[in-house]
């Protein structure tokens, strides 16, 4: 007889990451093409000398540096093993059986899985024009709503909500409901569409901003992210945190990235330029795609997404399908983008 497991896990799917195929071009996981800067690499190598010791579980130095970086006091900062772990902690401190967690859909695939794992109910509000429909989300709030996720830019559709609309939305949400603005891709926003998310934290004690070092800072393999929120929320997060999950190496790398933030963020300009080029080429080829404010583009190939991804894989290009809703394609190095565009222009399903 095997150990008895929670019955609700039986139909809960596991999170499926982007595939990796040896020898193929992988543009499925929104990774940066750039390796660490020499200064970041040096910090990593130095930290390796101390990996026989436990990391600083309070992240004192990193929290102080992050606080200075975002212009808050350290007690407004929480660090996690990637922002995805902070998503789980935020669900844990707000929601349990009978509670509801609200978000637009399609969005970050981990949200419904983490909500169901906590025993709560995910409430998925359909997107409008591939973007969070904030009015519809307000209408979906019930007396059981405990938490709202706003993924901005949205993963996988690449879109952002209007900054003023986001501010009005936060103002309209009842203050006992937590609003989490998940900004994993915020460094790629242009065109004046970046919200004053930290201003929302200062004005509303129920707002949390999540950011990560995995994307623009290039530390996806080291797993480190952070939350900015009211100190009461930060204190609650510490009660459900799994100790020592952000390693000494990842902390050292994050601090070095903050030291080199200007240089690292300059790299995003090259990504944005490629995003513009790739988007224009796809539209010229006949694809319909929303304007991207992330390091990826979204192809809403309804009913054809799996075939597109399979055919791309046969051409040694790995993209990320989302059911039959569409395909997410990471903006990569120019030669990798060219390989993808070569496939996309000649894809039989486009005819």
Swiss-Prot record:
Function of the protein: Aminotransferase that catalyzes the conversion of aromatic amino acids and 2-oxoglutarate into corresponding aromatic oxo acids and L-glutamate.
Pfam families in the cross-refs: Aminotran_1_2
InterPro entries xrefs: Aminotrans_II_pyridoxalP_BS, Aminotransferase_I/II_large, ArAT, HisP_aminotrans, HistidinolP_aminotransfase, PyrdxlP-dep_Trfase, PyrdxlP-dep_Trfase_major, PyrdxlP-dep_Trfase_small
Biological process (GO), any one: L-histidine biosynthetic process
Assembly and binders: Homodimer.
Superkingdom to which the source organism belongs: Bacteria
Catalysed conversion reaction: an aromatic L-alpha-amino acid + 2-oxoglutarate = an aromatic oxo-acid + L-glutamate
Gene Ontology molecular function terms on file: aromatic-amino-acid transaminase activity; histidinol-phosphate transaminase activity; pyridoxal phosphate binding
Name of protein: Aromatic amino acid aminotransferase
Gene name, Swiss-Prot/TrEMBL: pat
Family, similarity comment: Belongs to the class-II pyridoxal-phosphate-dependent aminotransferase family.
Keywords: Aminotransferase, Pyridoxal phosphate, Transferase
Modified residues (N6-(pyridoxal phosphate)lysine): 215
Cofactor: pyridoxal 5'-phosphate
Keyword Transferase: yes
EC number of this enzyme: 2.6.1.57
């Amino acid at each position: 007889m095997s150990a008895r497991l929670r019955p609700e896990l039986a139909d809960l799917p596991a999170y499926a990451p982007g595939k990796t195929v040896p020898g193929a071009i992988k543009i499925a996981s929104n990774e940066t093409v750039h390796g660490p800067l020499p200064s970041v690499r040096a910090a990593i190598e130095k930290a390796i000398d101390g990996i026989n010791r436990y990391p600083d579980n309070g992240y004192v130095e990193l929290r102080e540096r992050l606080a200075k970086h975002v212009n808050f006091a350290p007690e407004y900062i929480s660090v996690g093993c990637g922002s995805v772990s902070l998503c789980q902690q935020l669900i844990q401190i707000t929601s349990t059986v009978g509670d509801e967690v609200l978000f637009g859909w399609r969005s970050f695939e981990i949200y419904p899985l983490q909500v169901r794992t906590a025993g709560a109910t995910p409430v998925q509000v359909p997107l409008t024009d591939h973007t969070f429909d904030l009015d519809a989300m307000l209408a979906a709030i019930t007396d059981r709503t405990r938490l709202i996720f706003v993924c901005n830019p949205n993963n996988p559709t690449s879109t952002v909500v209007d900054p003023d609309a986001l501010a009005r939305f936060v103002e309209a949400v009842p203050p006992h409901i937590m609003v989490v603005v998940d900004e994993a891709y915020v460094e790629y926003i242009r065109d004046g569409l970046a919200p004053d998310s930290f201003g929302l934290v200062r004005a509303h004690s129920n707002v949390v901003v999540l950011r990560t070092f995995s994307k623009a800072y290039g530390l996806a393999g080291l797993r480190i992210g952070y939350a900015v929120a009211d100190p009461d929320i930060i204190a609650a997060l510490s009660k459900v945190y799994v100790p020592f999950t952000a390693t000494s190496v990842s902390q050292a790398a994050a601090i070095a990235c903050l030291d080199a933030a200007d240089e690292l963020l300059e790299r995003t300009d090259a990504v944005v330029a490629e995003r513009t080029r790739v988007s224009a080429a796809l539209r010229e080829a006949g694809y319909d795609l929303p304007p991207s404010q992330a390091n990826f583009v979204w192809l809403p190939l309804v009913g054809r997404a799996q075939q597109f991804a399979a055919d791309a894989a046969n051409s040694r290009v790995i993209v990320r399908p989302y059911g039959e809703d569409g395909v997410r394609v990471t903006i990569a190095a120019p030669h990798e983008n060219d390989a993808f565009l070569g496939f996309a222009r000649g894809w039989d399903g486009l005819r």
